């Protein structure tokens, strides 16, 4: 069989738009908000659809322990706590553009988790 020329030009495949959720967690609020602002600014420069940052409830981890190691003396206690702050950012874009946006410098102590789903 011979190849038939139909006269049609090949159609470029559409770039797949994904729903991307970026989860940021940190113990320091200032560095967390700075990274959020940088990510959102980068997404707005690329004209992407952005939702967030959604501020999730702060988790407070508490430990109460005796001050004295030997058990002698009055019963005095130390109370320690650590607060973990969390932000969610949703983007609707191709995954290649998100790689460019997330390549910004991220503050130390901020953990970034990227989840990609089909739109």
Curated annotation (Swiss-Prot):
Q: Name one Pfam family in it.
A: Ribosomal_S10
Q: Which GO terms describe its biological process?
A: cytoplasmic translation; positive regulation of signal transduction by p53 class mediator; translation
Residues annotated as carrying N6-acetyllysine in the record are 34, 75
InterPro entries per UniProt: Ribosomal_uS10, Ribosomal_uS10_CS, Ribosomal_uS10_dom, Ribosomal_uS10_dom_sf, Ribosomal_uS10_euk/arc
SUPFAM superfamilies reported for this sequence: Ribosomal protein S10
Query: Residues where N-acetylalanine occurs?
Result: 2
Q: Where is this cross-link: Glycyl lysine isopeptide (Lys-Gly) (interchain with G-Cter in ubiquitin)?
A: 4, 8
How is this chain modified after translation? Polyubiquitinated by ZNF598 via 'Lys-63'-linked ubiquitin chains when a ribosome has stalled, initiating the ribosome quality control (RQC) pathway to degrade the potentially detrimental aberrant nascent polypeptide. Deubiquitinated by OTUD3 and USP21, antagonizing ZNF598 activity. Ufmylated by UFL1.
Q: Where is the protein found, in the record's own terms?
A: Cytoplasm
Q: GO: which molecular function terms? A: MDM2/MDM4 family protein binding; RNA binding; structural constituent of ribosome; ubiquitin ligase inhibitor activity
Q: Which terms in the GO cellular component ontology are assigned? A: cytoplasm; cytosol; cytosolic ribosome; cytosolic small ribosomal subunit; extracellular exosome; membrane; nucleoplasm; synapse
User: Which keywords appear in this protein's UniProt record, sorted alphabetically?
Assistant: Acetylation, Cytoplasm, Isopeptide bond, Phosphoprotein, Ribonucleoprotein, Ribosomal protein, Ubl conjugation
Tell me where in this chain the PTM Phosphoserine is found: 93
Residues bearing PTM Phosphothreonine: 9
Gene3D superfamilies found in the cross-reference section: Ribosomal protein S10 domain
Please list the residues that carry the modification N6-succinyllysine.
8
Give the family, as the similarity comment puts it. Answer: Belongs to the universal ribosomal protein uS10 family.
Q: Tell me the subunit arrangement.
A: Component of the 40S small ribosomal subunit.
Which HAMAP family does the entry link to? Answer: Ribosomal_uS10
Q: What is this protein called?
A: Small ribosomal subunit protein uS10
């Amino acid at each position: 069989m011979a190849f038939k020329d139909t006269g049609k030009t090949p159609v470029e495949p559409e770039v797949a738009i994904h729903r991307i959720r970026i989860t940021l967690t940190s113990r320091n609020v200032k560095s967390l908000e700075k990274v959020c602002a940088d990510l959102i600014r980068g997404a707005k420069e690329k004209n992407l659809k952005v939702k967030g940052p959604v501020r999730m409830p702060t988790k407070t981890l508490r430990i109460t322990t005796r001050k004295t190691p030997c058990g002698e003396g009055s019963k005095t206690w130390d109370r320690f706590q650590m607060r973990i702050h969390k932000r969610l950012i949703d983007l609707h874009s191709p995954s290649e553009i998100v790689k460019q946006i997330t390549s910004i410098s991220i503050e130390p102590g901020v953990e970034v988790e990227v989840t990609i789903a089909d739109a």
